[in-house]
Amino acid sequence: MTSELLVAGSVALDTRDGPFGKVRETLGGSAVYFALAASLIMPVKVVAPVGLDGAKRVAQAFSGRTIDVDLLQILDARTYRWRAHQDHGRNIDLGSSDNIYDSWEPTMPANFEGWAFVGSMRPDRQAQLMGMLGAAKLLAADSMLSYVQARPPEARDVLRRSGWFFCNEEEFSALGGTDPEEFRRQWWLQGLVVKAGAMGLAAYTEYGVVRVPALTSRPILDTTGAGDAFAGGMLARWLSTGGLPAGLLDALVWGVACASITISSIGVKGIAKATHKELEQRVVEVEECLRRES
């Protein structure tokens, strides 16, 4: 079915410190943030590996949501770990333990023809997953600065396979980008989303550029996962409303609203507890901000 949404990505146990204090082995990961945001709008399938030490926390976070975990593999391995220090809204990577990818043999729905997002993870695995999603009507991917820097050829392979690509300004520069529209054409992308934190974001397509401001009137406690939550909200909203070019601005607004809910709390707490009604209220705030800046 072309109306299905799937995310393939990471499940993580994060240890981070920043203005919010310190959290140790709290639930995170690209697949988790994306799925929690998307499931506020429509059902979503999750493809990811998790160790025995993290499976219970994932089940608790996903409880009550329309999240299909049939392809979430629980392995006898340590869940992916990530350590970071947050400074001025930016996560400085302090290292990770990603050996779980070595024992993971991912499976996909046969001939999946819906929309798929391959979240940040070790790029060789990203590329493998994208190769398994060749029939997807829309195939999107995200990046992670540390992997772009450590594995540039594999990161570019992910970019080459993408229809839509999501990155922040640092990742864009690390991939050799200077002019976003030129970059989009160079890599034959249907769409490129460049995120600029508190400055908002811009989406580049063959129809032009669409900009949406960040919602700065709300408190910002922890920016981790904001990009994945944004992608989940944006793609779920766009797909659920038909996926036409005219609906892109609306979809971006919903994505920003999901990101705003996420960063208002530490870790996944905010987006995991959010309701559709709360999301709709946040969308109104983003729309008001957009009107003020237009």
Q: For each of these PLM feature ranges, what is it?
A:
Residues 38, 168, 227:
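Short, conserved phosphate/pyrophosphate- and ester-handling motifs at nucleotide-, phospho-/glycolipid
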Residues 135-138, 145-213, 219:
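Conserved phosphate/ATP/ADP-binding segment of small-molecule kinases
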Residues 35, 39, 239:
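Gly/Ala-rich phosphate-binding loop of Rossmann-like dinucleotide-binding domains
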Residues 117-122, 143-144, 168:
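Catalytic beta/alpha-barrel core
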Residues 9-11, 30, 229:
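Active-site metal-binding loops of divalent metal-dependent hydrolases
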Residues 36, 81-85, 200-204:
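Short beta-strand scaffold segments in enzyme catalytic cores
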Residues 4-5, 13-25, 40-119, 124, ...:
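Conserved N-terminal subdomain of the carbohydrate kinase-like
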Residues 45, 215-292:
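Conserved post-catalytic alpha-helical subdomain immediately downstream of the catalytic base
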